[in-house]
Amino acid sequence: MSVVTSIRKSLVPIHREGYPFIAIAVVIALGLMVFSTFLGMIGVGLAIWTALFFRDPPRVTPVRDGLVVAPADGRISQVGLARPPRELDLSDEPLLRVSIFMNVFNVHVNRAPVTGRIERLAYKPGLFLNADLDKASEDNERNGLVISTPLCRVGVVQIAGLIARRIVSFVREGESIGVGERFGLIRFGSRVDVYLPVGTRVLVSEGQLTVAGETVLCDLSAQQPRETAYRVS
């Protein structure tokens, strides 16, 4: 193994969506360095922070029918019943909603909570309230998708926050997606809601920290637990 390969493997991968922002931060740092070493170092720190924000580390995802994994890194902010956004055409009645709040220090690449087919994809412009507020689910800019599985339909909604002003989606309607696969990204702080059938067994609690693609949120299966496989992505 070459030295270059060793160094490359030791570095945290950066998602391509971050390249323009990192480049801008580097240019600013170089410009500040011309006027002041102190200001230049602040610029370098900003560039490093920007790169870390767009980091995209590999994850080891548990793979078993019925398991629902966290779509985002962050903190469980709410677990309860709520009506899903109308544009998803998911249900007119309240469903189980698990909300994950992401701060600006979390990884912001979002991963599919289940394996299935993307039945619907819907973007809705809106406000930029604090994503930790309950009404952010209704009023903020959001991008939602419905994933159809053999057991049920699962709704996933990316919600913009105070700082986040751009939701990025990597998928299209009709495509198949595997649990733990990347489906989108929200820039600079936000929230992700997962909508599930009422009665789903929840395995997390409010305040708990989550890791996208790894933390198991719920179990949709009523069967006895079977052997769980794991996949790195």
Swiss-Prot record:
Catalytic reaction equation(s): a 1,2-diacyl-sn-glycero-3-phospho-L-serine + H(+) = a 1,2-diacyl-sn-glycero-3-phosphoethanolamine + CO2
Pathway: Phospholipid metabolism; phosphatidylethanolamine biosynthesis; phosphatidylethanolamine from CDP-diacylglycerol: step 2/2
UniProt-recorded Gene Ontology molecular function terms: phosphatidylserine decarboxylase activity
Residues the record marks as site: Cleavage (non-hydrolytic): G189, S190
Record GO biological process: phosphatidylethanolamine biosynthetic process
The family this protein is said to belong to: Belongs to the phosphatidylserine decarboxylase family. PSD-A subfamily.
PANTHER family named in the record: ARCHAETIDYLSERINE DECARBOXYLASE PROENZYME-RELATED (PTHR35809:SF1)
Protein name per UniProt: Phosphatidylserine decarboxylase proenzyme
Organism name: Xanthobacter autotrophicus (strain ATCC BAA-1158 / Py2)
